[in-house]
Amino acid sequence: MKGLVKVNLGCGPKGKDDWVNVDYGILALLAKYPFLKKIAMRIGILPKRYTKWEWPKNLVIHDCRKKLPFKDNQMDYVYTSHLIEHFSKYEAINMLNECFRILKPGGYIRVIVPDLELLARKYVECDHNFFLANTDKRHAKDIVLADLFNMWFYTEKNREPISSFYGSLYHKFTRGHKWLYDFESLSLMLKDCGFIDIKRRKYREGNVPDLEFLDHFQETSLYVEAMKPTHTNPKLLESFLR
């Protein structure tokens, strides 16, 4: 694996130092600039639980909804976990197109999102315990099943008003879920971007390296990998055959 160029988009505090780690938002900025973190803690914007997180030292601050700061055909692997569900669908498609651009022919992408099919099935089955086990315990007490289900789609501030000024400021810089995917919908998006060999994978299993460190959220996630073709881009070939 020596010499491979690997990028983790939306790395959060789980980045690995031999990857290019990219993230954006207030938490990433505070991790990148410790003096801002101290100020945020002092005025109460940053919850104490976030102070224990160790972000990667080589963190790149970049909004992945915009053009990625990498050259064409530069990356061997792209990994992105629990990121695109925070984007509008068209923004997620734009990012996946960018991933296709920066991957080398034969390179792999691994996309991990909350599994919409699983969540829907657990709701229909009235599996209250599943949602309680996979919901922030601070917000799960005495909440009915429908509310637990809705919390996968909407932000906390949609459920109840944020009482403090600093709490409101914090929520302005955080993003709830905007669009969820099942295997069929995510596969179609990847296919439309030009990817082939699209497969559903298991937790910490696949072609992308370092999954034993990178993969998390086993109970609720959909894991999908796809490859950039080594031959002519199928989208361009199709346009010539029309």
Predicted regions and their residues:
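S-adenosyl-L-methionine-dependent methyltransferase catalytic module, highlighting the catalytic core
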Residues: Y90-E98, K104, Y108-R242
